[in-house]
Amino acid sequence: MIEKIENGLYRIQIPLPRNPLKSLNSYVIVGKRSLVIDTGFNMEECYSQLRKGLEELGLELKKVDVLATHLHADHLGLAGKIAKNLLISKVDAEIAIRSVIEPDYWKELVEFYIRNGFPEKEAKKVAKIHPAVKYASEFSGEIVFLNDREILEYGNFSLKVISTPGHTPGHVCLYDADKKILFSGDHILFDITPNITFWETMRDSLGEYLLSLEKVYELEVRKTLPGHRNFYN
């Protein structure tokens, strides 16, 4: 299902089967080169819906870039199937790559869970069924690292990258100052919590998240477009 939000801007709701999040908001900015903001899990149900939406918009995949607001598989998973160029923060890209190519990543995570009171059996189970394991991206194209405050031009949008660590170490939001539109990823959600968790690269993820909230609080926003559920004017 495609929903027009503004001229040149659309939302495709991507189902997330058997997941309490239910769906992901994938935003598409149409232009000479089009931009897909967040993609869904690397699984057939998600791919089919995203591909169908892009085809309905008349987009050629060779003219599409993907931007992941952060590393989670529900946002990054399909990048490798629809684009050759991926835009993502450097810190989140490094974590995502490590989680795929380094076996010790999950071993260390399981050990951390156990040290902090998780039953060993459950900790090992989590490492096997974690979405980052089951639905990870198979991306093999060019990765373009996003920098805080840089401007991206797609279609009739001028997007300022805003570093908003908290939900993940390298989470970013995108802000069009003229249109007063904020793409908030999972930094700001209206119907559910953004879920702030421990990251080994962050000493205080909750503190960082609160600082990031202050950062976007000063923006003049007409419409906030989150990664999940409803968006609000």
Model-based region annotation:
Residues 41-44, 133-136, 158-233:
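Metallo-beta-lactamase
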Residues 2-57, 174-184, 190:
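Conserved beta-strand hairpin/beta-sheet module of binuclear metal-dependent hydrolase folds
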Residues 19-21, 144-146, 165-168:
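A short catalytic or substrate-binding loop motif that flags glycine-/basic-rich loops and adjacent residues
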Residues 1-4, 102, 116-118, 123, ...:
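Accessory terminal helices/loops
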Residues 29, 78-83, 213-216:
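Alpha-helix C-terminal capping segments
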Residues 35-37, 67, 86, 181-183, ...:
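Residue-level marker for buried hydrophobic side chains located in beta-strands
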Residues 7-14, 130-135, 155-157:
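Short Pro/Gly-enriched beta-strand edge/turn motifs at strand-loop
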Residues 45, 54-152:
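Active-site HxH/HxHxD metal-binding segment of metal-dependent hydrolases
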